[in-house]
């Protein structure tokens, strides 16, 4: 983070990864380039993403876009702001899908709220080729799962998915996917005996149940 007379800026550089993380995430340069290229591509398409203010071969700079939805969920005194932010998140995701784009990983830590709108960051999983209802359904799954994993629940999701649906977001593919994958819930329950503190495993069953019952 950089404090400047023009405001707060964020500097992103190529990550230096250990062998283990390179195997899991791919090379740091490749992830950096996908993130930067995704921000450029979607920004030029008029989508709500972080604008790149300056860049070089191994860095780029974006403005501060406010608080992430993940951080906002931890602020117990921001209930009105949280409702507005999740409503805006649903609209932003619907706008992305309406133009035939998917984010790839729209988790609550990758959506920023500035008090007026939600914008997306971290586009390492974005691909302009991922344009099908299956990819939109995966976005919804990642978003809902991230809410439950962060300790949120139906209040936040109702705001987001109502706004998503009202803005023309296609939920039917997400509902169908969740119903097909319901068998994962009991399997995750068994795995939690081995990893009882895993938030990701704990969030799987409520994620599938919530999406499968959506209307």
Predicted regions and their residues:
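ATP-binding glycine-rich loop module of kinase domains
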Residues: 1-33
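Conserved structural core of kinase catalytic domains
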Residues: 15, 31-32, 49-87
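Structural motif at the C-terminus of the N-lobe alphaC helix and the adjacent alphaC-beta4 loop
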Residues: 30-33, 37-49
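Conserved hydrophobic alpha-helix
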Residues: 42, 92-96
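Catalytic-loop of the protein kinase fold
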Residues: 98-108
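Conserved protein kinase catalytic/activation segment
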Residues: 110-122
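C-lobe/activation-segment region of protein kinase-like
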Residues: 119, 123-215
């Amino acid at each position: 983070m950089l404090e400047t007379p023009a405001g707060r800026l964020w500097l992103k550089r190529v990550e230096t990864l250990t062998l283990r993380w390179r195997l899991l995430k791919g090379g740091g340069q490749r992830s950096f380039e996908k993130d930067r290229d995704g921000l450029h591509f979607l920004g030029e398409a008029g989508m709500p993403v972080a604008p790149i203010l300056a860049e070089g071969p191994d860095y780029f700079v974006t403005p501060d876009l406010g608080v992430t939805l993940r951080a906002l969920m931890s602020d117990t005194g921001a209930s009105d702001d949280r409702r507005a932010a999740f409503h805006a998140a649903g609209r932003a995701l619907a706008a992305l899908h309406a133009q035939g784009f998917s984010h790839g990983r729209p988790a609550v830590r990758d959506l920023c709220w500035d008090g007026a709108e939600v914008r997306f960051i971290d586009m390492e999983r974005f691909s302009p080729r991922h344009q099908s209802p299956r990819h939109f359904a995966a976005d919804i799954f990642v978003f809902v799962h991230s809410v439950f994993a962060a300790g949120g629940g139906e209040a936040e999701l109702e705001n987001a998915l109502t706004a998503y649906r009202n803005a023309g977001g296609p939920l039917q593919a997400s509902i169908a996917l969740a119903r097909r994958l319901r068998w994962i819930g009991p399997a995750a329950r068994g795995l939690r005996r081995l990893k009882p503190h895993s938030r990701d495993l704990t969030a799987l069953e409520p994620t599938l149940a919530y999406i499968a019952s959506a209307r």
